[in-house]
Swiss-Prot record:
Name of the gene: pgap-2
This protein's name: Post-GPI attachment to proteins factor 2
Cellular component terms (Gene Ontology): endoplasmic reticulum membrane; Golgi membrane
Transmembrane segments: 16-36, 69-89, 109-129, 143-163, 180-200, 208-228
Superkingdom in the source lineage: Eukaryota
Gene Ontology biological process terms, A to Z: GPI anchor biosynthetic process
Coiled coil: none
Source organism: Caenorhabditis elegans
Length: 263
């Protein structure tokens, strides 16, 4: 891509997707492996002492060192790009050439709501990362509930908006992105309710192996959430986020105001 006179920085959008997908998935994988290798007995223990072979996400990422530091660093690093992408996706939807000709105020409100939910999801994720269940179980549980609710509503709303604004049919990759969004959202919602059931069943009946299944469902929920957000690769395929001066006189926009295609 050629730089204009007022362009300060240009970053291919695919690197943002690598960051928002690669950092949290790597953090989860590393922390689970380390907890199994270094703290197997502690990380897999349960309150009723039944057989369990996998740590829950909370046990794997927020209880022992060095796992909790790896998790906090990698999640913290990926939050910044997530915030930028949340606003960029909102502008992407509103800028669709195939958006409806009527109901502009309603559409803008829903796009703003989706963006707000996405930002709030990241806030709750950051709070979950900073406050472990062992430090403040009540607050940690509330943050998890907020994260899950915001995630589900955002996934469903943004997928609907992607179709409603015409982005699904605007490019050849739009249909693929839409299908992957539906897949990621469906798996996340399924994992949420299945995880709640397994958690209840474990605490009620204390059956061997149930908490292991719960942990697997937790991992699947996290990975499906990451997968959903990585569909942005298709939405912004071949594009760059450009930092540019407002008037060519040294006043700079801190958020992406121009998304150009590679030339």
């Amino acid at each position: 891509m050629a730089f204009g006179d007022d362009d300060i920085l240009s970053i291919p959008f695919k690197y943002f997707v690598i960051c928002i997908g690669g950092l949290p998935s790597s953090a989860l994988l590393i922390c689970v492996i380390l907890s199994l290798l270094l703290h197997f007995d502690q990380a897999t223990s349960t309150h009723c002492e039944v057989a369990n072979w996998l740590p829950s996400i909370s046990a794997a990422v927020s209880t022992y060192t060095p796992e909790k530091y790896i998790w906090r660093i990698l999640i913290g690093l990926h939050i910044g790009p997530r915030l930028v992408v949340a606003i960029a996706f909102r502008n992407f939807l509103l800028g669709s050439p195939l958006r409806p000709l009527t109901g502009h105020k309603r559409l803008r409100f829903l796009c703003n709501l989706a963006c707000f939910l996405n930002l709030l999801e990241n806030f709750f994720l950051l709070a979950l990362t900073s406050i472990s269940s062992s430090e403040d179980h009540s607050l940690h549980a509330k943050c998890f509930g907020g994260f899950a609710i915001c995630s589900i509503i955002y996934m469903l709303l943004s997928t609907w908006l992607f179709n409603e604004t015409g982005r699904r049919t605007a490019t050849n990759l739009g249909q693929r992105s839409h299908e992957y969004k539906i897949l990621g959202a469906a798996i996340f919602v399924l994992c949420f309710f299945l995880g709640a059931y397994l958690y209840w069943r474990h605490n009620t009946y204390c059956e061997p192996g149930i908490y292991t299944l719960f942990a697997l469902v937790e991992y699947s929920a996290v990975l499906s959430n990451i997968f959903f957000h990585c569909t942005l690769y298709y939405d912004f395929h071949g594009k760059n986020i450009v930092l540019t001066s407002s008037f060519g006189g040294g006043h700079y926009n801190l958020l992406p105001t121009q998304i150009d295609k590679d030339t």
